[in-house]
């Protein structure tokens, strides 16, 4: 259910590197489909409950690889109890040399009040420690699942990769403001690039989250390509908060990006295309946010970014009309990656679904 998954690199208040991988709700089922290739509905349904999980799973195998000699990692399998209360948890120490360690389910103490699987927790000695983890579920007799084939390397240097990236451009919009920002960058003038969004902008799924999040990588790529001094004159602001929709984004734009008028960003990437599903205004609030940013006196450039969930869903159909009305550049990740996930027999994806997604909601 996890294959070479990066863990670690998360900020911590107590000096311990805790990295949870949540398996509640549909998360474990999605991992089983995406990583394990399982399509047996009976098996998938059993993974949703603690009772079904323990009936199905004989043991949990965990292997970790990392340059962490003599440190080790503590792995915990946790369940949640009735009405979301804390459930039973069992742990084991894992070496980081790739050796598989086995947790036999019947040899552990579990509570009868456990209702659902909750998390795989990896505890590293220090917050900045990073490793890769593989978690396998060994099933009891009578259940059959397909063998897992290793993914080939991502085909970066291929025409197909270029075609995939090109598909992400939903609209170039009226790019006069973008051109102005690029000229500022080339001229070495002070420029501020800001990112506003939810957990994807925050860096969930990226390991380490601050260095490998899409916002940081985008900022670094822009500086490398367009500035004469590797971005020495470019200010980077990342305002991503997990679980926040555009209703809070309007408030956070003032607080976290403009700092109540003290900062005037030149380029803003807005990413709320998966957090706004519950927006009762059906996009009106999102448009208010876009108008607020777009109408600033310094005339910043605005790019709308539509990320995607592992079930090939986002809010492009609802939000793209906003971008078209305002003639904004728009990037739709769904159009880029989802079509090539569904290749035919004998064909190769540029990047597989399990390579692209860290979990149900976040890219790796």
Task: Annotate each predicted stretch with a short phrase.
Residues 100-102, 272, 289-290:
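Residue-level detection of beta-strand scaffold positions
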Residues 220, 291-295, 320-324:
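Surface-exposed alpha-helical segments enriched in charged/polar residues
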Residues 294-303, 328:
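A short helix->loop->beta-strand "cap" motif at the edges of active sites that frequently abuts
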């Amino acid at each position: 259910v996890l294959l070479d998954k990066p863990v670690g690199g998360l900020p911590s208040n107590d000096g311990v590197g805790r990295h949870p991988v949540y398996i509640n709700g549909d998360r474990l089922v999605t991992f089983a489909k995406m990583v394990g290739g399982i399509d047996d509905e009976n098996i998938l349904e059993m993974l949703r409950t603690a009772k079904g999980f323990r009936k199905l799973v004989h043991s949990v195998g965990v292997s970790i690889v990392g340059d962490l000699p003599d440190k080790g990692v503590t792995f915990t399998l946790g369940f949640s109890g009735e009405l979301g209360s804390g459930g039973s948890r069992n742990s084991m120490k894992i070496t980081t040399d790739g050796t598989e360690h086995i947790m036999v389910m019947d040899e552990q103490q579990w509570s009868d009040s456990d209702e659902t699987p909750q998390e795989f927790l990896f505890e590293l000695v220090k917050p900045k420690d990073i490793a890769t983890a593989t978690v396998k579920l060994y099933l009891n007799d009578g259940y059959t699942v397909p063998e897992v084939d290793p993914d080939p390397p991502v085909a970066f240097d291929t025409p197909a990769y270029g075609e995939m990236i090109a598909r992400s451009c939903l609209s170039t919009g009226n790019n006069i403001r973008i051109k102005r920002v690029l000229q500022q960058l080339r001229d070495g003038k002070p420029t501020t690039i800001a990112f506003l969004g939810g957990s994807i902008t925050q860096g969930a799924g990226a390991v380490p989250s601050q260095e490998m999040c899409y916002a940081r990588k985008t900022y670094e790529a822009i500086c490398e390509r367009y500035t004469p001094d590797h971005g020495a004159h470019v200010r980077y602001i990342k305002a991503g908060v997990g679980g926040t929709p555009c209703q809070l984004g309007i408030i956070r734009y003032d607080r976290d990006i403009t700092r109540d008028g003290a900062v005037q960003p030149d380029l803003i990437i807005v990413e709320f295309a998966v957090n706004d599903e519950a927006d009762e205004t059906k996009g009106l609030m999102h448009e208010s946010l876009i108008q607020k940013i777009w109408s600033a006196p310094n005339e910043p450039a605005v790019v709308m970014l539509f990320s995607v969930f592992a079930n090939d869903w986002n809010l492009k159909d609802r939000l793209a009309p906003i971008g078209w009305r305002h003639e904004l550049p728009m990037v739709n990740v769904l159009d880029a990656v989802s079509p090539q996930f569904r290749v035919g027999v004998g064909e190769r994806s540029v990047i597989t679904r399990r390579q692209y997604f860290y979990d149900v909601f976040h890219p790796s």
